[in-house]
Amino acid sequence: DELSVTDFMRKYGMPERINEEVFISMAKALDFIDPDKLSMTVVLTAMNRFLNETDGLQMAFLDGNQPDRLCEPMKQSIEKNGGKVLMKQRVKEWVLNEDDSVKHILMANGEVIEADEFISAVPVDVMKRMCPEPWTKMPFFQQMKQLEGIPVINIHLWFDRKLQNVDHLCFSRSPLLSVYADMSTTCKEYYDEEKSMIELVFAPCSPIAGGKTNWIAKSNQEIVDATMKELERLFPLEIGKKAPDGVGAKLLKHAVVKTPRSVYAAVPGRNKYRPSQETPIKNFTLAGDWTSQKFLGSMEGAVLGGKLAAEVVSAKAKGMKTAGLKKINDDIMAEASTFSGQGWKRPQKMEDESPVVFGAGYVLEENDEQQLMTIDPEQLTEMDGRSQATKDAVQEAVLNRTR
């Protein structure tokens, strides 16, 4: 885990062509970053799964959109078994008891939620912002300072004709594009024999991930223009002036979904800081793909992290022994002994309206960007094409962060 993919290659004398033919596309697909930034552990873990699991190489798509085809059936199952799912509820803070256990959750609307057990499944950057101050002094939670989510952009493109495609997820070595698929072929809900709907991942999209441009700070139109230019280079016979008809496929509409902090950046040396699902807080458990488990920061990792969190809660409820806390690295223990509160990202409030506050991907409007500035101004350091008011707000947010 201490070596990047490129460092690993050089150490063991692997030719550069392997990087160009294999690792660039793997790195961008697995963690949305370039191989010189990615821990080799991520690639080896993925290859191990591919080779040792019966269906390890198979790719699967939902047959429709995620809220309806995945989330709604889960919600119905919970409600059928007596549970309740509350939507669009914003947490203001976790209120603690004297022993630092959770007393209740205070919602933005003033409601108080009491429970025997509490589980957090938010992204690591959101967890860092919401972490109660007494917990920030604990070595267990200080591990989170070593983990940082990276930005990613998903782009949806609707064309006026059917493009040549394969019924599969495609991996790219493009400097801008990561993975893509023609959803009109791969997904039942979007099936269309006449027109293509391409979904792709735009990555790396910031210097954090190895990119040269902070695309999160660019306008949606700038991102779409760059994407179309790259697609024209990759598919000259279908898109652009080199197509047989001299025009190529016409873009009918588009959607740009930005996730300012997505999966944690699996850069070298980070894996040892992923915390266990069990925490030092007796009634609080962590879930999420960034917690310690065999998979990467991914949907698979999120599912497994949730399963392990459920096992912790279930074992405690039955009075059974749990797996216990993961050993904390020595450097974290040493730092915790002299912790002064510096370096912990904590915005003034957490009840803002925009979904990006809680780690969601979103089609950002200007008001969403201004809320993003409050919690993560580094994401919007380049504001070409934005209003002067927005630029001024960025500068003010950065100043407030450094004061």
Locate predicted features.
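A conserved FAD-binding loop/helix module that cradles the flavin
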Residues: 291-313, 317
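Mid-domain catalytic core of redox enzymes
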Residues: 89-211, 219-235, 255, 351
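Residues forming the flavin
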Residues: 63-66, 72-76, 90-96, 101, ...
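Active-site/ligand-binding neighborhood in enzyme catalytic cores
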Residues: 1-103, 108
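A short coil-to-beta-strand element that immediately follows conserved catalytic motifs
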Residues: 87, 238-258
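Active-site-proximal substrate-binding core of FAD-dependent oxidoreductases
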Residues: 314-391
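N-terminal mitochondrial targeting presequence
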Residues: 400-403
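FAD-binding beta-loop-beta segment adjacent to the flavin cofactor pocket
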Residues: 188-192, 257-286, 290-292
